Amino acid sequence: MGKISDLNYSQHITLADNFKQKNEALDTWYVGMNDFARIAGGQNSRSNILSPRAFLEFLAKIFTLGYVDFSKRSNEAGRNMMAHIEFSSYSKDTDGNEKMKFYMNNPEGERADLSKVKIEITLASASTKGIREGHTVIIFKQSDGSTNRYEGKSFERKDDSSLHLITNKVLACYQREANKKIARLLNNHQKLNNIQELNDSQELNNSQKLNNSQELNNSQVSCKGSVDSTITDLLEKALNKG
């Protein structure tokens, strides 16, 4: 376990073509983030997702902890951001340094001239006094072909858990909460339309089936504690090793 680095954000924002603090590219991000905030229901924690920098802070926090309780209202905005991730890839170089890439739709919308946003999370193999350093960054292209890169906050790990294992844990926590939401929506839909009468045991069974399909029951994954080594092989289909 480690603590989030106290480095100032302003020290990590770098230029990747023609960066300006309030340029049009950043404005489109704000528009996209506000859309996601509305999806999240206008909760008090809207500030969690109103900028690329804030989303990177959320990622740094959960990768420092190695888990996330997505059922908490304070993590709702981050959970809705995670929902926009389309696919991912994982790589490890000869020195043991790890890199996880998440690809998500451009907040400006689905357009042929806009590539997907890439979120990179890296974790060094070498440690200093038992501490390994990780880093987060968001990269996306504008319609004119220029590339914007936003450096996020660094994070630290004081154990030897692989980035792949930590990512599996985070995604497992996300999927389990998503399954609960789906189960609730299905049950509400069935009740409102009187399609089928469900007693308590049937509702519980349906919810359990959803969880079992993803192999994410409580005995395998704890989203309120440190990394659980039993979930190493979970969600392999969701992570395409590169």
From Swiss-Prot:
According to the UniProt record, one GO cellular component term is: extracellular region
Q: What induces it?
A: Member of the type 3 secretion system (T3SS) regulon. Expressed at low levels and only when the T3SS is active, in a MxiE-dependent manner. Expression requires MxiE, IgpC and a MxiE box.
* Location in the cell: Secreted
| This protein's record includes keyword Secreted | yes
Keywords attached to this entry: Secreted
Instruction: Describe the task this protein carries out.
Output: May contribute to pathogenesis, although some of its characteristics suggest it is a fossil gene.
Name recorded for this polypeptide: Invasion chromosome antigen R
Q: Which organism is it from?
A: Shigella flexneri serotype 5a (strain M90T)
> Its gene?
icaR
